[in-house]
Amino acid sequence: MYPKINTIDTYISLRLFEVKPKYAGYSSVDARNKSFAIHDIKNYEKFSNAGLFYTSPTEITCYCCGMKFCNWLYEKHPLQVHGFWSRNCGFMRATLGIIGLKKMIDSYNDYFTHEVSVKHKNRVYTHKRLEDMGFSKCFMRFILANAFMPPYRKYIHKIILNERYFTFKFVAYLLSFHKVNLDNQTTYCMTCGIEQINKDENFCSACKTLNYKYYKMLNFSIKL
């Protein structure tokens, strides 16, 4: 349905040169392949052909536009996801052309909508699965607030590895509702998960002091 990917074509190379890739060192497919191969990743060709190179166990990056993708290992359609979230990427436009990119985005819209809808409906069920895995409510609140700071990342990785159908964003979205207790009345600090706070706050006084420089970064209060 779509044009065959050809990153060797001179026209494509010219177009990519014009947009000045953010990570020029990974402009070639071979370089992107090596980034996966040295970490013993299998079946990586679909990712490297989509312009992506290995960054970390939970993240890959487009060498051209710099967009990062989380929980990528089990993604079946990296090219479509890349085009959907980064429509102005020079690699995607040069590879598929404007018309091909538009067709791909349109065809992916229905799939994406369905996936989000299913995950949204199953959030209560998946919450129970997380509890069954041994994650307490307070612990999950704590991990969410510190998800992007070592050494707590490994717990997010544990969730992903045990429940392959979770996406990183969905896990964060799922866990974030633990700011409000299940009775929807008691509100807890998003860092320690122990101290009760007002509903218009996210952290207790002690955690605000400890995490002052991260306060804006951690200040999210999604409620399901």
Curated annotation (Swiss-Prot):
Positions bound to Zn(2+): C62, C65, H82, C89
Domain of life: Viruses
Keyword ATP-binding: no
Organism of origin: African swine fever virus (isolate Pig/Kenya/KEN-50/1950)
SMART domains: BIR (SM00238)
Subunit structure: Interacts with subunit p17 of host CASP3.
Intracellular or extracellular location(s): Host cytoplasm; Virion
Disulphide-bridged cysteine pairs: none
GO biological process, one term: symbiont-mediated suppression of host apoptosis
Record's protein name: Inhibitor of apoptosis protein
GO cellular component: host cell cytoplasm; virion component
Role noted for this protein: Prevents apoptosis of host cell by inhibiting caspase-3/CASP3 activation to promote the viral replication. Also induces the activation of host NF-kappaB.
Segments annotated as BIR repeats: 29-92
UniProt GO molecular function: zinc ion binding
Any matching Pfam family: BIR
Keyword field: Activation of host NF-kappa-B by virus, Host cytoplasm, Host-virus interaction, Inhibition of host caspases by virus, Metal-binding, Modulation of host cell apoptosis by virus, Virion, Zinc, Zinc-finger
Regulation: induction: Expressed in the late phase of the viral replicative cycle.
Family under the similarity heading: Belongs to the asfivirus IAP family.
Keyword flag Metal-binding: yes
InterPro entries, sorted: ASFV_p27_C, BIR_rpt
C4-type ZnF: 189-207
